[in-house]
From Swiss-Prot:
<dbReference type="GO" id="GO:0051881">
    <property type="term" value="P:regulation of mitochondrial membrane potential"/>
</dbReference>
<dbReference type="InterPro" id="IPR035649">
    <property type="entry name" value="EFG_V"/>
</dbReference>
<dbReference type="GO" id="GO:0005739">
    <property type="term" value="C:mitochondrion"/>
</dbReference>
<dbReference type="InterPro" id="IPR031157">
    <property type="entry name" value="G_TR_CS"/>
</dbReference>
<protein>
    <recommendedName>
        <fullName>Ribosome-releasing factor 2, mitochondrial</fullName>
    </recommendedName>
</protein>
<dbReference type="InterPro" id="IPR035647">
    <property type="entry name" value="EFG_III/V"/>
</dbReference>
<dbReference type="GO" id="GO:0032543">
    <property type="term" value="P:mitochondrial translation"/>
</dbReference>
<feature type="domain" description="tr-type G">
    <location>
        <begin position="45"/>
        <end position="337"/>
    </location>
</feature>
<keyword id="KW-0342">GTP-binding</keyword>
<dbReference type="GO" id="GO:0032790">
    <property type="term" value="P:ribosome disassembly"/>
</dbReference>
<dbReference type="InterPro" id="IPR030851">
    <property type="entry name" value="EFG2"/>
</dbReference>
<dbReference type="InterPro" id="IPR041095">
    <property type="entry name" value="EFG_II"/>
</dbReference>
<feature type="binding site">
    <location>
        <begin position="54"/>
        <end position="61"/>
    </location>
    <ligand>
        <name>GTP</name>
    </ligand>
</feature>
<dbReference type="GO" id="GO:0003924">
    <property type="term" value="F:GTPase activity"/>
</dbReference>
<dbReference type="InterPro" id="IPR009022">
    <property type="entry name" value="EFG_III"/>
</dbReference>
<keyword id="KW-0648">Protein biosynthesis</keyword>
<dbReference type="Pfam" id="PF00679">
    <property type="entry name" value="EFG_C"/>
</dbReference>
Length: 860
């Protein structure tokens, strides 16, 4: 570590080749190179779609604000603490200082365009991250240099890894006490299971008080020292550059660190890239002589292949290190032309039962059909050999107070143009696309078109498009869609089951309509929010992903939307199920002489619905949301109905498929109304439709008649069973897989607390690194890679000792017992313990715990 003044003091805009060009405010290079009006016309090869992902409070929004400022998109830097950031624009976000909704924004940089999505870091909003990752080509993972790799970082990293998304790591908060760049790099290798190349490393200066101060970075690729002006009024644009090769005699320690970092980089890249080996041999086997262009190309190839992760460092809050990170986005992350082809299938709705007859509506199978895909080197993805076919995925819907419903989408092929016709392949409905927008946080910009590889917004769709819908268009050409095009399905977005409930009710009857309207808006925006109604209590039950999730929902209802409502505390989401099979049939009928009727029976199962034997039966329909199954037995459909179809005597206004769907929907409604003992929705339950009748030659009855009788039949069966055999029903509770990360000296006390207070079942206790498949590789890799000294960790001679001293406890825990666990864990571990949870499934509540839960809800 060297105390030095700058050799060259220049105010410049950092570029990947370190050209020295003016970067003073008012002479914005990005604006000069790429005007705002031309931003939307940037070709796909100069476009990047990135997400900012991390654990909460790692600095995602702070980093994004600097990117906006340095690109010339904003005139001042927003501050999370002051609540004036561009991407956190919801009142709840600004009040709490956290990101709740992912926000999209587009910036220019080095004649390129970067579409950025800033995602939440709190575990309750993981679904926001999940649906954002579906439309991203790459991501920047931000890590807190003090905390290292945290639980949520590990979780979202694995999500991105499963999708094959290339990543860059940015070690933030290097200015903080206790910041450990090298320790964090070791954790990246160990916990995230990735090779790394250090593209820059921290630079420290030691003033007279002998406390190291983070001042800049050593650029390993270009062999330069970049030092930022740290005056209180500096905004990060005043940077001095020192050429370490020219000044190696004056700065031998810095030069040696860069040399060792380069050597490690070349060794890592050379394991998979022969061009590096060739260049090394051509340059006298001197690591420092390998050209920057050769290294850049190799790093990009390795990043795109998920072979390596480029690592950068900085302090976004202190305006240090962000510009090199932005260059890395352009240099190392893929354009839409370089990313992998998305998962696309052609898929139409499936008929509920096999039927014959010329009059029935024809439906294709639900089995995915291969779709011809190719990548045009200039325009990008081409689907079904049709370069004029536009496809887009709707990944987010919001309701703006003045602009109405706004649907965020990613265009995958073709060009989406305003004033043309689009089709929603889920509904088959055609819509007139009037206006297209690009979003700048909360501010829209109207554009005439949005081309492949870009993210935009459609306004004015109301309820016609929801999250996960695929949109197709032929652009200005008004031609019909063929069967394959009209049933395309892109990148299905899985919605996790809600785990917490909270009840809400209007203060007066006059407040009901407005409250219901507000709830519908929230449901449209957030597919992870579920709503049901307790008819006995007259309460609306909101179900969400966590306590904070529901608290934010309630805040939005009452504070933002001005709904007059009474709110209850957040509680765990329980379910009911049959404790044992019940083969007793129940018949329900209506109309003259029972001409509309149904016969059903009920059963139950353990585990996931799709894995049960019931799911393999003919006519089985799996209801994934509540893990239920409805079986419409093939023999249940009356023969006279099929005869009426064959002989063209079908007089009903409804097709046979519509009638069958009504039967199923009636069953679904009844199951959601709740069980007879606890009043919770039924789960892991089978409804078997054994027989049903409907007068096909009558105009007096419709599909609603069938929906009503199936609902009443299931409701009656549940009620009768509850009155005659209360013990037949069991209470189910959510069980979580919990991972607790601690130091070994806290192991005994934490295990005791988990098993006694949390009622946990311990499944394993290991060294933290032993949970990784490639333990030996991770240890060897972290030992092999050069990392610079951590000046804030002088007493740690062997970082491996610290890593190996950490334990991970894996346990299955009832969710109810984990409420408030974090504060207890921190108390036990002196603030060093952390944990994360993932949903395993629903399990029957054991008798020893049933009484306390029953008392909580005033049962029995």
């Amino acid at each position: 570590m060297t105390n030095t003044g700058p050799i060259v003091r220049r105010v410049f805009r950092y570029a990947s080749v370190l050209d020295t060009i003016c970067y003073k405010r008012g002479i914005h290079s990005s604006r000069a190179l790429l005007s705002e009006s031309r931003l939307n016309s940037v070709p796909p090869d100069r476009t990047r779609n990135i997400g900012i992902i991390a654990h909460i409070d790692a600095g995602k929004t702070t980093t994004t604000e600097r990117m906006l400022f340095y690109s010339g998109k904003t005139r001042r830097i927003g501050n999370v603490d002051e609540g004036d950031t561009v991407t956190d624009y919801l009142p709840s976000e600004r009040e709490r200082g956290i990101t709740i909704q992912s926000a999209a924004i587009t910036i220019p940089w080095n004649k390129n365009k970067i579409n950025i999505i800033d995602t939440p870091g709190h575990a309750d909003f993981t679904f926001e991250v999940t649906r954002s990752l579906r439309v991203l080509d790459s991501c920047v993972t931000i890590l807190d240099a003090v905390a290292g790799v945290e639980a949520q970082t590990e979780k979202v990293w694995k999500q991105a890894q499963a999708l094959g998304i290339p990543k860059i790591a940015y070690v933030n908060k290097m200015d903080r006490d206790g910041a450990g760049f090298s320790r964090t790099v070791k954790e990246i290798i160990q916990k995230l299971q990735t090779r790394v190349v250090l593209c820059n490393i921290p630079y420290w200066e030691t003033p007279v008080n002998d406390v190291p101060i983070f001042k800049g970075v050593l650029d390993v690729l270009n062999k330069k020292l970049l030092k930022w002006n740290s005056d209180s009024n500096a905004n990060g644009t005043d940077i001095s550059v020192t050429d370490l090769e020219k000044e190696m005699d004056k700065y031998p320690e810095l030069y040696e660190m860069v040399s060792k970092s380069r050597e490690s980089m070349v060794e890592t890249l050379g394991e998979f890239d022969e061009t590096i080996i060739d260049s090394f041999l051509e340059n006298d086997e001197d690591y420092m002589k390998i050209p920057v262009a050769v290294l850049n190309s190799a790093i990009k190839r390795g990043t795109l292949a998920n072979y390596v992760t480029p690592v950068f460092c900085g302090s976004s809050f202190r305006n240090i290190g962000v510009q090199p990170l932005m260059d890395a986005v352009v240099n190392f992350l893929p354009s839409p032309l370089e990313t992998k082809v998305p998962d696309i299938s052609s898929n139409a709705p499936k008929a509920l039962a096999k039927m014959k007859g010329k009059n029935r509506k024809k439906k294709v199978t639900s089995e995915p059909t291969d779709v011809p895909l190719s990548m045009d080197p200039k325009h990008g993805l081409v689907i079904n050999k049709n370069p004029n076919l536009t496809t887009a995925l709707a990944f987010k819907v919001i309701t703006h107070p003045t602009r109405g419903v706004m649907t965020f989408f990613r265009v995958y092929s073709g060009k989406l143009t305003s004033n043309t016709t689009i089709m929603n392949t889920r509904t088959g409905k055609k819509l007139n696309l009037r206006k297209l927008l690009l979003m700048h946080g909360d501010e829209p910009e109207v554009v005439p078109s949005i081309s492949a590889g870009n993210i935009g917004v459609i306004s004015g769709t109301d309820d016609d498009i929801v999250t996960g819908d695929t949109i197709v268009s032929h652009g200005p050409v008004n031609k019909p869609f063929n069967d394959l095009e009209s049933s395309l399905k892109m990148l299905p977005i899985e919605i996790p089951p809600p785990l917490f409930n909270s009840s809400i009710e209007p203060l007066t009857a006059g407040d009901t309509r407005h409250l219901n309207s507000c709830i519908q808006i929230l449901l449209r925006e957030d597919p992870s929010l579920k709503v049901s109604v307790d008819e006995d209590l007259g309460q609306i039950i909101l179900s969400g992903m966590g306590e904070l999730h529901l608290e934010i929902i309630k805040e939005r209802l009452v504070t933002d939307m001005k709904a007059n409502a009474r709110l209850r505390d957040v509680a765990v989401s329980y379910k009911e199920t049959l404790g044992k099979p019940n083969y007793k049939s129940v018949t329900q009928s209506t109309g003259d002489n029972g001409c509309v009727s149904i016969e059903i029976s009920m059963d139950s199962f353990e585990g996931l619905a799709e894995e049960s034997s019931f799911a393999d039966e003919d006519g089985a329909i799996v209801l994934e949301h509540e893990n239920n199954i409805v079986i419409l037995e093939p023999s249940a459909t009356p023969e006279y109905m099929q005869t009426a179809i064959d002989e063209r005597r079908w007089k009903s206004d409804h097709s046979l498929e519509d009638l069958q769907e009504s039967l199923v929907h009636g069953c679904i409604t009844a199951l959601q109304l709740g069980g007879p003992v606890f009043g919770f929705a039924l789960h892991s339950t089978v409804i078997r439709i054994k027989n049903w009748h409907f007068p096909v030659d009558s105009k007096d009855y419709n599909s609603s008649s069938l929906l009503d009788i199936s609902r009443r039949a299931v409701t009656k069966n549940i009620k009768d069973l509850g009155e005659s055999e209360k013990d037949l029903f069991s209470l189910l509770e959510p069980i979580m897989q919990t991972k607790v990360y601690i130091n070994s000296d806290s192991l005994g006390e934490v295990v005791h607390d988990l098993t006694h207070r949390c009622q946990a079942t311990i499944t394993s206790i290991d060294d933290e690194s032993e949970n990784m498949d490639a333990l030996n590789w991770a240890n060897e890799e972290s030992e092999r890679v050069y990392v610079p000294p951590d000046y804030t960790m002088k007493n740690t001679n062997n970082l491996q000792v610290e890593l190996r001293n950490k334990k991970v406890i894996v346990a299955e825990t009832p969710l109810r017992e984990m409420i408030g666990y974090l504060s207890r864990l921190r108390s036990i571990t002196q603030g060093r313990g952390v944990f994360d949870m993932s949903y395993l499934g629903m399990k029957r509540v054991i008798k020893s715990r049933l009484a306390s839960i029953s008392n909580e809800f005033n049962f029995m």
